[in-house]
Amino acid sequence: MDAAALQYENQKLVQQLEAQKSKMRALEGKFKELRDEQCSYDNTLICLNKMWNQLIDDLVLLGVRAGGDLNGLQALDHEEMSEESLESCPSEEIFLFRLLNSRNFRNNDDSSLSKLVEEALALRYSTTVTLMKSLQEAFAVQQARSESLSLALNGQNSSEDVIVALENHNDYLKEVVDNLRQAVSIINRKHEKYLDEIEAFKNNQSRELHEVKCLSGELEESMAELEESRRKLAVLQLQTGGGSLMNTSAPNGVNGSVSTDKSSDKGMGWRDLKDAVEEAKTLAANRLFELHETQEDNLILSKQLEDIQDQLKDENYIVTSKPYTILSDQLHHLNAEIERYRGLVEVLQNEKDQLMQKEEEMLAKAESVDAVQQSITTYKAKIEDLEHEIQKLMAEKNDLEIKAEEALQDSGKKDFKDEIHVMAASLSKEMELLDNQMNRSKDAASEALALREEADYLRTLLAKKIDEQKEISDRYNTQVTEIKSLKALIETLDQEKQELQFIVDMLGKECSESRAISEIEESENRARKQAEYLRKCLEEHNLELRVKAANEAETACQQRLSIAEAELEDLRAKVDASERDVMKLKESIRIKEAEVDGHISEIETIGQAYEDMQTQNQHLLQQVADRDDFNIKLVSDSVKMKQAYGSLLAEKNMLQKQLQHVNSSLESSKLKITSGEEQMKTYVAQAMKSSSENRHLAISLERTMLEVSDAEKELKWLRSATGSAEKEYEINQKKIAELKMELERERNERIKLEEEYEEVKNEVSELTSETEETTIQKLQDEIKECKAILKCGVCFDRPKEVVITKCFHLFCSPCIQRNLEIRHRKCPGCGTPFGQSDVREVKI
């Protein structure tokens, strides 16, 4: 074949390929359009199906919440369409297939398909209608229950009937709560099932992602192999092109002429090239087919991923759906009711705790009183101990004086030593007594600290009582405002009732004041005469228009009369209703007054308890202050005692030193006597020694006298301390007497306040009676004024019977007849002229 023919064939093939490509592009565009339409249809179907399923879920859950059966929860199990069933279904029927949840479309003809569609739609519609009917029935049952319960509570039933109704309602509520719990458990199971499915989808997704990665690796390997095959093809083409050139150039260079086998070699080369190109094309087509398959697999996998993500989103939608939110709201409502009941129980427990606290406070008060009494007894015992100690000290002083006199009388050395020993023993005893006093002062200080702690505790109790009093006063103020508002309502209702009674009385009087038959006949005769006269005047003056106006006025008056009668009936009904309301309000006022009396009594008792607490607190504060002063005095006394103890210790040390010195002097004197006896000294030296000893004795006697004076000073101080203690005891007794007097005064004041309260009550009752009398007088005055308004303004005796149509003023008929007899007729009220035709009778 020639190259031109091959080129021509190649051009034709290229044109055919381009035409096929254009057709393929057009078909792909149409396919994309159809696919977009299918996607839009699918989206609308998904939205519609979700809305329908949501409606069914709402109906089911509302029915369960309204107290219906749990059988409707089966409707929550919506059947999901599998992808295999959708792939097996034709594209024209996917919409209906998804909408009606049917699997029979793919095996039916066009004639039976419409019937199946209608049947499926009717089935789904019937299920929704049955759910709606069951929900309406549940609402009706709940409404009937609530109405019966409200009638039982608001009606005049006995307490036993009300208790039975409440128990029935509680049983019903328990059943509803059990149903809700079962429904919640079922929904939780479904939720767990969906979670398991989600986990399975996630596992499948991870597995498919792994497969996609493997396929992408295989695809890359196949692409690499394709590139290698293309490279080999290009190399083969180059080799074939180079070999042909070598074959053509070699014979030309060697022989210098073209060989005869040139055409055959070319034909063989072109055939080999064609075969190689065809093989390469087949390989490329196979590779392209494999590529398309892998791309389609990737698209399928991506669709599956999108579907799984949509399903995951649907799971999130389940969590945020209306049924789930309704059930969560129901749970919150039930939790709120449980918390409310818990709050009531806590309030009752708090009241119980408050009562227990009050009892504990009363016990604490009694214990504090007992502690105060015990402290008083302990102080009395301490005072007695101090008196005994003073007596002992006085006796010791007397003993010391006697001993001093005996020491002055006796000048012997042995007696002096014995006296010194006795003095040392007495000083040791006094030191022990001082130690005991120090221990007692420490005990008193510890008791003072305990009393301070008790005072702090009582202050906290007082603050709590003040807060409770404030709360009670706030409650009392709120109740007083409610009582005032109720009294204002009662006053307004009383006024309306009185007005309505007044109107009823007026209308009754108007109805009762019917004229006699003779007066009616006279009025009829007069009316006939007036009619004849009017006819004559109308015939003379052609006053047909005025007659029409009169007829219209008569019809208007009749209409007004009918309206007034209807208003009368309405007013009577209102009067009856107001009387009922007044009775109810009176009963409520009585209940509120009883509650107010109870609250007032409680407030009085609390006020009295508060005053008692204040007095006790003041008394305790005074006691604490006295204890503090006494403790300060004890501390100062202890300091002084410590100082005295130190001085006594110093004196004791001095005395011990003196004793040692005396002992040493005695030993020296003995030695001197022995030495004098041995050396036979003169008596002058002995006399000097005796004089020196006498001097020492005089010094020791002076020191003993000083010690006696110090002891006398201490006795005086102790006497002054006992006197101050006695004075404090007398002051405490006086304070106790004053507190008793204050208690008696407070009791008298309380009695006076109760008497004043009774007087105020009597005054309030008198004032209420006076206000009722004044209101009755006002109403009587208003009745008189209204009667005066209904009477004629000229004679003030007869009722108003006639109307002047020009000015619409009302008068009695005799007064108007007098004016009609006069030529210049004028209205007595405003002075406007009128004629006989302007006068009309009116029934009031």
Curated annotation (Swiss-Prot):
Disruption-associated phenotype: Semi-dwarf plants, early heading, and partial sterility of spikelets due to defects in the anther developmental program and pollen formation.
Annotated keywords: Chromatin regulator, Coiled coil, Flowering, Metal-binding, Nucleus, Transferase, Ubl conjugation, Ubl conjugation pathway, Zinc, Zinc-finger
InterPro entries: E3_ubiquit_lig_Bre1, Znf_C3HC4_RING-type, Znf_RING, Znf_RING/FYVE/PHD, Znf_RING_CS
Top EC group: transferase
A GO term for molecular function: protein homodimerization activity
GO CC annotation: HULC complex; nucleus
GO biological process, one term: innate immune response
Keyword rRNA processing on entry: no
PTM annotation: Auto-ubiquitinated in vitro.
Pathway(s) of this molecule: Protein modification; protein ubiquitination
Localization of this protein: Nucleus
Reactions catalysed: S-ubiquitinyl-[E2 ubiquitin-conjugating enzyme]-L-cysteine + [acceptor protein]-L-lysine = [E2 ubiquitin-conjugating enzyme]-L-cysteine + N(6)-ubiquitinyl-[acceptor protein]-L-lysine
Listed SUPFAM superfamilies: RING/U-box
Keyword Coiled coil carried by entry: yes
Spans annotated as Disordered: 244-269
Note: Plant silencing HUB2 exhibit early flowering, increased plant height, and increased panicle and grain length.
Entry text on domains: The RING-type zinc finger domain mediates binding to an E2 ubiquitin-conjugating enzyme.
Family: Belongs to the BRE1 family.
Protein name: E3 ubiquitin-protein ligase BRE1-like 2
Protein source organism: Oryza sativa subsp. japonica (Rice)
